[in-house]
Amino acid sequence: MKIVHSILITVIALVAFYIQIDNPVYIFQFYLSVLTFCFLFGAINKEPNICHISLMLAFIAVAEYSLFATGVIDLGQHDDNYLIIGTIVFGLQLLINIFAVLLFVFRIQISRFFSSSSKIILTDFDGLFHWLFIAAGVVNILALIENSLRNALGWHSLTFIYDTYEIYGYAIIALTCGLLLTMLILKVKNRQLT
């Protein structure tokens, strides 16, 4: 089996795993453990690019989780105005996605600011991570539009994004894990060839 097939199967399995768990706390913990593994791999093998990408992803995940899971951002009660709550929640997640896109677009400059390592280079994967957050941003824009149509205009049957929102998030997390694991596999494979 080729590496590409293994990675594709891993990503699909992770999406299915996340959907079955359907618990943000457990998924967050699992995601952080994957990021920690990747960070440790990068640190042990002196690969600052992997370390920095893992740290950036962890920073974004912890920031988002801290805002929503700890109650800093109120997810609303039964009798709240869902238009306002949804706009705040999806709007804040859109802002986090925009921040993440900028973080990964300027990843090299940020990495060089914090480290003087000569190994900090543009990797083949630097052009991919920000696209995951662009995709997440598009989902958040669609969620904002749907929230406005449903709660401001009374289109209460319009719930496609709302019903599948977590699945999109799980897929993006799984793709992120897949990209990181691919980076690790290629580093190991390239090291064996040299």
Which positions does each model-derived feature cover?
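Juxtamembrane "helix-exit" motif on the non-cytosolic side of transmembrane helices
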Residues: 15-21, 66-79, 145-157
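Short, aromatic-rich membrane-interface segments at the entry and exit
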Residues: 22-32, 48-53
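Membrane-proximal helix-loop-helix units in multi-pass membrane proteins
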Residues: 61-129
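Alpha-helical transmembrane segments and their membrane-interface exit regions
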Residues: 33-43, 59-65, 95
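Hydrophobic, membrane-inserted alpha-helices
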Residues: 8-17, 31-41
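Membrane-interfacial loop-to-transmembrane alpha-helix junctions, especially the N-terminal start
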Residues: 1-5, 46-57, 129-132
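C-terminal membrane-adjacent module
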Residues: 99-194
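N-terminal membrane topogenic signal
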Residues: 1-8, 166-168
